[in-house]
Amino acid sequence: ALIIGAGGVAGVVIHKCCQNSEVFTDICIASRTKSKCDKFKEELQDKTKTNITTAQVNADNVPELVALMKEYKPDICINVALPYQDLHIMDACLECKVDYVDTANYEPEDTAKFEYKWQWAYRERFEKAGITALLGSGFDPGVTGVFCAYAQKHYFDEINYIDILDCNGGDHGYPFATNFNPEINIREVSAKGSYIQDGKWVETEPMEIKRVYNFDQVGEKDMYLLHHEELESLALNIKGIKRIRFFMTFGQSYLTHMKCLENVGMLRTDPVE
């Protein structure tokens, strides 16, 4: 496997691959900053049977990606870089006929908006090349889709309503910190929310819809309706669906800090002069 990325999510993926060394006998960790990849190798090489190599690559540069894939010859490319780089990595996989997996859908770097249309447009080309692209294979999206599909297949004739509730019960003691890449997290939270009702998208203002939910073993948490990519794919694949919504929990300290950043213009996507 070729793993592209060396951030927090990549760290989880790399550890999981090394825990399953009978499947992932060899991995190459590649990122713009090779020293980060080397750090993972140093930490894990004595704890796993997986053979680990590292490489430097700019995931925005398709020829660089192609050269790395031709040199390493992976069976699969696991993309845990930034969502802006999805299409470049998919282009390289097409050229080298390598199967592709990612955890978040593409979004343009200059616009805080994400949807599947750009990646779904690759379907025919991947089919013709005889390779597979598994999109949004993290937890949400990913496991949430598996839960819904399993419920449809084994428990229900049809499903009319789906609410996905994303709650983090941990507390690291910081007044402001994100669960994953700060830029992506802040863009997601500050963008307009949306949900699907009777086959149509309904748009809301950012953080407009709030609910309080009592989570098992965690307790009551404030949660807010967000736009999220699995709404698109579930609406296409779940029979009888009338409404799908996605909620995520946030503490007031997080939201206050985010509002301060917004007020001083630091949530904008245009360059600062």
Language-model segments: residues:
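C-terminal catalytic/substrate-binding lobe primarily of soluble NAD(P)-dependent oxidoreductases
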Residues: 153-273
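Conserved Rossmann-fold cofactor-binding substructure of NAD(P)-dependent oxidoreductases
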Residues: 57-74, 81, 85
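Rossmann-fold NAD(P)-binding glycine/threonine-rich loop
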Residues: 104-132
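Conserved N-terminal Rossmann-fold NAD(P)-binding element of oxidoreductases
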Residues: 1-8
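ADP-ribose/adenylate-binding Rossmann-like module
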Residues: 80-83, 92-115
